[in-house]
């Protein structure tokens, strides 16, 4: 009798080990798994074990497998390294040792190493898989390629797979990608475009391993299974705040080359914690088992995230980090790093469910404990007449009410879902979650474990085992689609850019950090609770803190100049606008304010929305200085920015809001629709003498202001109050207040921020009134006041 070869063992393995021949199922097809980077750290620590678990779970259900470990290493050395990695495979605790040994042996026989370095290597792999399937008479179900390699290698590998290793008709291809997925929005978009030229979206599975952690994976099922109890609670009326936390005790030693490029925000907040945030904040689809519906609702949550500003975050760095960087990367002494190893970020979700609820994201290295959790803290709206000693955990409404998805480690030491007993008794499926016995003396978030209904997994599984199973079964909701990835980078990139030169707060690390990293929030602004102690100075760099300076008053182009650090400047401008509003309302009963768009005023809008409760919004009319010729709902629309960052947060009567009519008769800025004339007529009818109480302008790097551009005479003189103009950048068509109308204002404030404005600031300071070259130079109110508001970077460089 001829003995079967290695690949001929496939059917024998399934028959003997899993099913017994009399009960053997018909094969559902053969699956080839190719692990690229098979000898790397991630593969050794998690991926081979995850693939072994996949083999245990699925081979007995009718599938046959082959496992190809691949790397750049030469065959002999690679085989030795892979064999060493496979030595640590383990079976479930409830499996008999003899059975475990048998299964391990079968898995090893089905696993082989091969070098994948050249196009010819990939061609040979494709031929070998096809030959194996044909030789054994198997039906091919699909091929899984796991990229456990650096992203810079993705393109070449993808090209080779696409050209040489695609399966035939009827079989699937699944390509698994590991982070990082870019460094910012642009790089992520470039990588996504490159991969998209080789693979279809449904073929790609971007891994965020936190989505495989059992407590995180339970968030949506928990919300679904407890809909009745949560429907009335999971909203801004009842939730005080949400905390999404990942703390580590280890530092970045040995990984500083990676950390210098990415830092803590890119490493954990942009991906892991943001993915968790969307699971908490998203609207529940009718069917949480439908991947498409889940992903669609998650994307809606991404799009509802309020834009982050510099004041949305605090950053820190453990004290020995810069020295580690110098040592590992061989940098010269006196070259401190500005890379944050700690970050706290305040996020708001701008929709009806979550308006005003703070989501706190925090992660860091060299902290006092290793722990991860999601904590939903509910408002305490009860008053208890009896003293605290009479409060019963299951009955008293005065005790804290919270739901915690405990990711792991910490005092508890394992994944768990905890619900305060005074909230409701939760349902979790008994086959996968069991109630935790009380552990006297254990305190979680200041309360004994007995205060909670606490559940832990019946069987703990590592994240990669869960995710590999989801890949095998094409459960896309556990992965990051391209559209979600880019939405996340759109959200995080502006903050990362604003922090690029920020000096992080130094902290000793561990328990010695004390209260140094405690932070607090007010409105949309986050700040450390304590000042930086002198003994931790000098830090990395010597940039002074904003609090070291007062607001500076001076002259610019013969008009008053106010200069300060950005936070102080915005605060001063907001206060001045409020003072002007109060004065106008007291004098004539209304305040007419014309606002510019762009990125600079966003911080001002947020400041006005969150910190000026005495502002007479009910008597304020809001106008636009200029508008892009796009629908008002378009992200490029100035009105959309005003709506997102100001209007939805304050009580301005809707009839006092005056967007520019750029979209009439289903057309954008058509001359024959006379939108500019209509806006001018509205101004004439409502604004006395067409004189706004205050006009807020900006200044472009080319000297343009409003949508009045250099080398274009449109809107610089004449009788027209509102004009259509052409911008050199897209979208080209604009509507704008004219320069004569702007100069009728009682007060004009020009806000100029950022180092990129330094050159034009210097140039405009030296020229006369030449609006055709530099439209901003034509701003000079006829009988009103002009005030310049510049941050130090724009003014001093």
Swiss-Prot record:
Entry-annotated residues carrying N6-succinyllysine: 213
Binding site for D-glucose 6-phosphate: 179, 209-213, 248, 267, 365, 370
Pyrrolidone carboxylic acid PTM sites in chain numbering: 25
A GO BP entry: pentose-phosphate shunt, oxidative branch
Gene Ontology annotations for the cellular component aspect, listed alphabetically: endoplasmic reticulum lumen
Secretion signal, residue range per the UniProt entry: 1-24
Residues covered by region (Linker): 532-545
Pathway listed: Carbohydrate degradation; pentose phosphate pathway; D-ribulose 5-phosphate from D-glucose 6-phosphate (oxidative stage); Carbohydrate degradation; pentose phosphate pathway; D-ribulose 5-phosphate from D-glucose 6-phosphate (oxidative stage): step 2/3
Superkingdom assignment: Eukaryota
Region (Hexose-6-phosphate dehydrogenase): 25-531
Keyword Manganese appears in the UniProt entry: no
Entry annotation: catalytic residues: 272 (proton acceptor)
Recorded GO MF terms: 6-phosphogluconolactonase activity; glucose 1-dehydrogenase (NAD+) activity; glucose 1-dehydrogenase (NADP+) activity; glucose-6-phosphate dehydrogenase activity; NADP binding
List of residues binding NADP(+) 2: 375, 623
Entry's family note: In the N-terminal section; belongs to the glucose-6-phosphate dehydrogenase family. In the C-terminal section; belongs to the glucosamine/galactosamine-6-phosphate isomerase family. 6-phosphogluconolactonase subfamily.
Described purpose of this protein according to its UniProt entry: Bifunctional enzyme localized in the lumen of the endoplasmic reticulum that catalyzes the first two steps of the oxidative branch of the pentose phosphate pathway/shunt, an alternative to glycolysis and a major source of reducing power and metabolic intermediates for biosynthetic processes. Has a hexose-6-phosphate dehydrogenase activity, with broad substrate specificity compared to glucose-6-phosphate 1-dehydrogenase/G6PD, and catalyzes the first step of the pentose phosphate pathway.
Listed name of the protein: GDH/6PGL endoplasmic bifunctional protein
High-level lineage: Eukaryota, Metazoa, Chordata, Craniata, Vertebrata
Gene name linked to the record: H6PD
């Amino acid at each position: 009798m001829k003995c079967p070869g290695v690949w001929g063992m496939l059917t024998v393995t399934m028959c003997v080990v899993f099913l017994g021949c009399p009960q053997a199922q018909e094969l559902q097809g053969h699956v080839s798994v190719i692990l690229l980077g098979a000898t790397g750290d991630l593969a050794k620590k998690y991926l081979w074990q995850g693939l072994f678990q996949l083999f245990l779970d699925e081979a007995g259900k009718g599938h046959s497998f082959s496992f190809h470990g691949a790397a750049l290493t030469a065959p002999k050395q690679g085989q030795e390294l892979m064999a060493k990695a496979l030595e640590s495979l383990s079976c479930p605790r409830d499996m008999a040792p003899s059975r475990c040994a048998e299964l391990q042996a079968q898995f090893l026989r089905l696993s082989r190493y091969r070098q994948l370095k050249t196009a010819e290597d990939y061609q040979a792999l494709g031929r070998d898989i096809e030959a194996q399937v044909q030789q054994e008479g198997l039906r091919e179900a699909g091929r899984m390629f796991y990229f456990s390699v650096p992203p810079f290698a993705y393109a070449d590998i993808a090209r080779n797979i696409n050209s040489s290793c695609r399966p035939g008709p009827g079989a699937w291809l699944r390509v698994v990608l590991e982070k990082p997925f870019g460094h910012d929005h642009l790089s992520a978009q470039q990588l996504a475009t490159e991969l998209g030229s080789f693979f279809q979206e449904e073929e790609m599975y971007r891994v965020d391993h936190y989505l495989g952690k059992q407590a995180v994976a339970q968030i949506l099922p928990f919300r679904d299974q407890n809909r009745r109890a949560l429907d009335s609670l999971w909203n801004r009326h009842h939730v005080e705040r949400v905390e999404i936390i990942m703390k580590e005790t280890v530092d970045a030693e040995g990984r500083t080359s990676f950390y210098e490029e990415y830092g803590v925000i890119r490493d954990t907040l942009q991906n892991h914690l943001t993915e968790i945030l969307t699971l908490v904040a998203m609207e529940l689809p009718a069917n949480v088992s439908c991947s498409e519906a889940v992903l669609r609702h998650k994307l809606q949550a991404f799009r509802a995230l309020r834009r982050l500003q510099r004041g949305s975050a605090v950053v820190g760095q453990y004290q020995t980090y810069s020295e580690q960087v110098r040592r590992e990367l061989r940098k010269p002494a006196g070259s401190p790093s500005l890379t944050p190893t700690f970050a706290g970020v305040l996020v708001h979700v701008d929709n009806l469910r979550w308006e005003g609820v703070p989501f706190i994201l925090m992660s860091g290295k060299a902290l006092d404990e290793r722990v991860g959790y999601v904590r939903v803290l509910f408002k305490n709206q009860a008053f208890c007449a009896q003293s605290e000693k009479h409060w019963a955990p299951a009955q008293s409404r005065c005790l804290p009410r919270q739901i915690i998805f405990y990711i792991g480690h910490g005092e508890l030491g394992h994944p768990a879902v905890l619900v305060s007993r005074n909230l409701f008794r939760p349902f979790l499926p008994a086959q996968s979650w069991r109630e935790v016995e009380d552990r006297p003396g254990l305190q979680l978030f200041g309360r004994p474990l007995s205060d909670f209904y606490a559940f832990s997994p019946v069987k703990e599984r590592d994240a990669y085992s869960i995710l590999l199973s989801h890949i095998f079964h094409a459960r896309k909701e556990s992965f990051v689609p391209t559209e979600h990835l880019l939405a996340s980078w759109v959200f995080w990139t502006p903050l990362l850019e604003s922090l690029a030169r920020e000096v992080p707060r130094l902290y000793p690390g561990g328990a010695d950090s004390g209260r140094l990293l405690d932070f607090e929030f007010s409105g949309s602004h986050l700040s450390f609770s304590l000042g930086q102690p002198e003994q931790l100075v000098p830090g990395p760099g010597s940039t002074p803190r904003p609090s070291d300076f007062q607001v500076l008053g001076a002259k610019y182009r013969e008009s008053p100049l106010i200069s300060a650090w950005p936070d102080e400047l915005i605060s001063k401008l907001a206060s001045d606008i409020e003072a002007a509003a109060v004065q106008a309302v007291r004098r004539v009963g209304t305040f007419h304010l014309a606002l510019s768009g762009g990125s600079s005023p966003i911080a001002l809008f947020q400041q006005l929305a969150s910190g000026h409760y005495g502002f007479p919004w009910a008597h304020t009319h809001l106008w636009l200085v200029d508008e892009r010729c796009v629908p008002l709902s378009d992200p490029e629309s100035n009105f959309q920015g005003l709506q997102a960052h100001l209007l939805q947060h304050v009580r301005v009567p809707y009839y006092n809001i005056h967007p520019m009519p750029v979209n009439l008769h289903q057309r954008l800025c058509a001359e024959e629709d006379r939108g500019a004339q209509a806006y001018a007529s509205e101004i004439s009818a409502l604004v006395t003498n067409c004189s706004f109480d205050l006009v807020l302008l900006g200044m472009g790097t080319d000297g343009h202001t409003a949508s009045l551009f250099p080398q274009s005479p449109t809107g610089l003189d004449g009788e027209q109050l509102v004009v259509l103009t052409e911008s050199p950048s897209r979208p080209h068509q604009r509507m704008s207040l004219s320069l004569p109308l702007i100069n009728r204002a009682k007060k004009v404030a020009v806000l100029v921020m950022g180092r990129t404005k330094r050159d034009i600031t210097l140039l405009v300071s030296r020229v006369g009134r030449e609006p055709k070259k530099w439209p901003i130079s034509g701003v000079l109110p006829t009988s009103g006041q002009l005030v310049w508001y510049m941050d130090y970077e724009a003014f001093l460089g």
